[in-house]
Amino acid sequence: MKTHLATLATLAVFAAFLCPSQAAIVWTGATSTDPFDDTNWDFSGSGVSAVDANVSVADDILIANGSIEIPNLGGQQRVQIGNGFTMTLDNTTFGLVAGGNDGTGGQPGSSGVNINLINGSQFNPFFIVNAVSLDIDSTSSATFGGGGNPVNISTINLTLGSTLSFRSETPAAFTAEHLSKITVNGVPAVEGDNIEIAPFNGGSGSQITAIPEPSSAVLLGFAGLALALRRRK
């Protein structure tokens, strides 16, 4: 009996691990691409009832197979994620209307929020701010429109295959202001080691590509050589 109960407990743990919790606020895009139009959201699984500019959303957010454009409101506005919560973009484009200079982030003094880009998502804000941890999977990209400090009090983790671009930060500006905020698979970014930095947007910007570390490339080379020798036999 004890063995049977232990087995059931183990299966329950694995089931919880394999079945991630659903986001409580879900994008429907029923009316428009405006994230501040509440008719575009399904709040039925949440205690939250609105998404307003510069007001913390105290729940996880899921935007799947969608297209969002932050409207060009007065001043710089943002989709503001509540402390400790996550916004996930799944096969989604998240950007700005023409001429927009808005972004997303946490509240001032935030203890940390997460933005995850998966399944070919494109994240194109002017900036992120206030303790954002942005994670970009191997199929997704992020392009920041702003200059100055578009990655403000925030960090970015790249995966091999992901792309990070800045429209108004030259390679020199990126290196001086943002290199220390970037990791590749959790390891600090080092130019020529695990990232390459190239000019972008006619030279006024920069594009960062994650590359295999030299040790990984050597191992892949040895593996390819071993496979070729085996085939010759």
Where are these regions (language model features)?
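Beta-strand-rich extracellular passenger or scaffold domains
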Residues: 24-29, 35-210
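Short, threonine-centered small-residue motifs that mark membrane-proximal processing/anchoring sites
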Residues: 12-15, 19-25, 204-222
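Conserved Rossmann-like nucleotide-cofactor binding loop
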Residues: 225
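Bacterial N-terminal signal peptides that target proteins for export
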Residues: 1-9
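C-terminal membrane-anchoring or membrane-association module
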Residues: 228-233
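Short N-terminal leader segment in a subset of presequences, especially plant chloroplast
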Residues: 9-12, 33
